[in-house]
From Swiss-Prot:
Signal peptide: none
Residues annotated to bind D-ribose 5-phosphate: 192, 216, 220-224
EC code(s) of this entry: 2.7.6.1
Binding site for Mg(2+) 1: 127
Protein name: Ribose-phosphate pyrophosphokinase
Subcellular location: Cytoplasm
Pathway stated in the Swiss-Prot or TrEMBL entry: Metabolic intermediate biosynthesis; 5-phospho-alpha-D-ribose 1-diphosphate biosynthesis; 5-phospho-alpha-D-ribose 1-diphosphate from D-ribose 5-phosphate (route I): step 1/1
Subunit-level organization: Homohexamer.
Cellular component GO terms, alphabetical: cytoplasm; ribose phosphate diphosphokinase complex
Reaction(s) this enzyme catalyzes, per UniProt: D-ribose 5-phosphate + ATP = 5-phospho-alpha-D-ribose 1-diphosphate + AMP + H(+)
Naturally occurring in which organism (per UniProt): Maricaulis maris (strain MCS10)
Length: 310
């Protein structure tokens, strides 16, 4: 087994390598003056089982192209099997046609990864579970729920805890965490009565006097979580925190969270901290390196990955 890292998240790659007690394969990744990407693998990988570690996070197009070129380099270097380890799968929100003459970009990206030569994909908390079906190669979608559960038990009293989905689409995800914590759930139902009218946050569930934890797969601008926290507090919640797998945190989302009424926002290291963002103690990071490392070990040894979640 060999591990190779792209440039999207080198700290996470090193943490995964440390977990597996395996070195990162020597490689050289360079961007030419015109923006083109060049990759050279500096070790023999012929006949090897190679795991290429690369999130397709910001800048999404650069990191996606880098992943494809790394896969192509491994194919041409005669690697026996290539697994694309993509902690954060970019373009996942474009998983369906949203209108006439629009693409399904998540499917296109899945096709590109397979066509480049990847034999399988390993990722974490896809925005929509059905994206697994977009790939024509084996795909393992890991869940960070147990990572979140362990942290919540360390930092929160669970007796009066309420797990809240910030939208109707995230109910299954919220219910899974609530089951682990033996907690109840509530739902924030966002509705816009008509064009030009502000969204109304309807709360489904009893939140008065409860300590609420919003649980979602992704935080981009932070607006949804901040607004949901305000709605919960106005309905009588004692406090509101948020746990999110992928902290994309664009458009100074950290500054928005810092000024919000959220107690804290907890994200994982699937995405690197955005450059030039407003630092805030309200944003805390957990690592998914042990989760990914164990899944990689199991894949390399032809063991069950699903048993991680039994």
């Amino acid at each position: 087994m060999k591990l190779m890292s792209g440039t999207a998240n080198p700290d996470l790659s090193r943490s995964i390598a440390d977990y597996l007690d395996a070195p990162l394969t020597a490689s050289h990744i360079e961007r030419f003056a015109d923006g083109e990407i060049f990759v050279r693998i500096d070790e023999n990988v012929r006949g090897e089982d190679v795991f290429i570690l690369q999130s397709t996070s910001r800048p999404a197009n650069d990191h996606l192209m880098e992943l494809l070129i790394c896969i192509d380099a491994l194919v041409r270097a005669s690697a026996r099997r290539i697994t694309a380890v993509i902690p954060y799968f970019g373009y996942a929100r474009q998983d369906r046609k949203t209108g006439g003459r629009t693409p399904i970009s998540a499917k296109l990206v899945a096709n590109l990864i397979a066509k480049a030569g990847a034999d399988r994909v390993l990722t974490v908390d896809l925005h929509a579970g059905q994206i697994q079906g977009f790939f024509d190669i084996p795909t393992d979608n890991l869940f960070a729920t147990k990572v979140m559960e362990a942290d919540i038990r360390r930092h929160y009293e669970t007796d009066n805890l309420l797990i809240v989905s910030p939208d109707v689409g995230g109910v299954v995800r919220a219910r899974a965490l609530a089951k682990l914590l033996d907690a109840e759930i509530a739902i924030v139902d966002k509705r816009r009565p008509k064009a030009g009218v502000a969204e109304v946050m309807n709360i489904i569930g009893e939140v008065e006097g409860r300590r609420c934890i919003l649980f979602d797969d992704m935080c981009d601008s932070g607006g949804t979580l901040v607004n949901a926290a305000d709605a919960l507090l106005e309905k009588g919640a004692i406090e509101v925190s948020a746990y999110v797998t992928h902290g994309v945190l664009s458009k100074d989302a950290q500054g928005r969270v810092d000024k919000s009424r959220l107690r804290e926002l907890v994200v994982t290291d699937s995405v690197t901290e955005p450059p030039n963002s407003t630092a805030t103690p309200k944003v805390r990071r957990l690592s998914v390196a042990p989760l990914l490392g164990e899944a990689i070990r199991r894949i390399a040894n032809d063991e069950s990955v699903s048993k991680l979640f039994d």
